Amino acid sequence: MSREQTLKLYLADLKKDYDYILIDCMPSLGMLTINALAAADSVIVPVQAHYLPLKGMTQLMKTIGKVQRQLNPNLKIDGVLLTLADMRTKLAKTTEDSLRENYGKHIRIFKTVIPVAITAAESSAAGQSIYEYDKNGTVAKAYAE
C-alpha cells in the first residue's frame, strides 16, 4: 500500500453507508490533499477572491493532473467555487474575471459566489456549521445554492 492511497483504502469500507463523503482539506498540497484527491470521485475547488489563491490554481491544476495520471484516473473536477468574496471590490471582480477567462473554457466556474462574512469565521470558532450558527445569513444561503 502506498502512502498516497491510505485514505482511499479507509474510505472504501465507509462508501457503502453514505451517498456522499466530503473531504475538506486545508489550502496546501501536502500528503493529506494528495490522499484526498486519490480517494475522491470528484473535486470542488474553493478559491478565495484574492491574488495569491488565484495564482495557486496553476499548481493545484498540475497536481490534480498528476493525481489523475498516477493515482486516480477517474477523478473529475466538478467546478471552481469563488469564496470569501466581497464583490464590491475591484480585487474580487478581477479574481472572478481571471478565473472565468483562464479556466472557464475547460472547468465549470460556479455562478454562486460565497461572500465574505464574519459569521463564517464565528461558526468555525463555535464548532458549528454555518447552518446551525446563522442559517438565514448570506453565507448559508450562498452555500445552499
Each language-model region and where it sits:
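Short glycine-rich substrate-engagement loop in P-loop NTPases that contacts/grips substrate
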Residues: 1-7
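Residue-level signal for the nucleotide or nucleotide-sugar donor/cofactor binding architecture
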Residues: 2, 55, 138
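Generic serine detector
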Residues: 2, 28, 42, 98, ...
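Charged catalytic carboxylate motif
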Residues: 6, 59, 142-145
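Residue-level recognition of oxygen-bearing side chains
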Residues: 6, 119, 138
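Conserved catalytic-core segment of NTP-binding enzymes
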Residues: 9-118
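C-terminal boundary of histidine-terminating zinc-finger modules
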Residues: 123-145
